Regions:
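Conserved catalytic alpha/beta core of Sir2/sirtuin-type deacylases, generalized to analogous enzyme cores
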Residues: 1-116
Length: 116
């Protein structure tokens, strides 16, 4: 696979399985599956960003895999907020935990954020 990135909306659903428009191989989502490793350069880029951010909003993770916790810890100067219906492995790492579903809470969050 050539790792070409493209929007799935550009591909008609009638052409399933979705193939890469560049090389013709099976397309896959731009995510890391369980058992796969992360691209080290992307991790370093994320860590650099997180160490400089003011606010980190962590939405909907169980925290049962190590990377979300590791990345949350890297935002050590930031106000860390968790949005999750249940306590998670991230809960001890944040200053604020909001117990709600993202679909319900995010519209209110954005409304307040945009209000100033």
């Amino acid at each position: 696979a050539c790792k070409t990135k493209f929007e799935i909306s550009e591909t008609p659903l009638s052409s399933i399985p979705v193939l890469c428009p560049n090389c013709g191989s099976l397309a896959r989502p731009h995510i890391v599956w369980f058992g796969e490793s992360y691209d080290e350069s992307l991790i370093q880029e994320a860590v650099s960003f997180l160490r400089q951010c003011d606010v980190l909003l962590v939405i909907g993770t169980s925290g049962m895999v190590s990377m979300p916790g590791f990345l949350t810890e890297q935002a050590f100067r930031a106000q860390r907020i968790e949005l999750n219906p249940e306590p998670s492995g991230i809960t001890p790492l944040v200053q604020i935990s909001i117990r709600a579903k993202a679909a319900e809470a995010m519209p209110l969050f954005w409304e307040r954020l945009n209000a100033g």
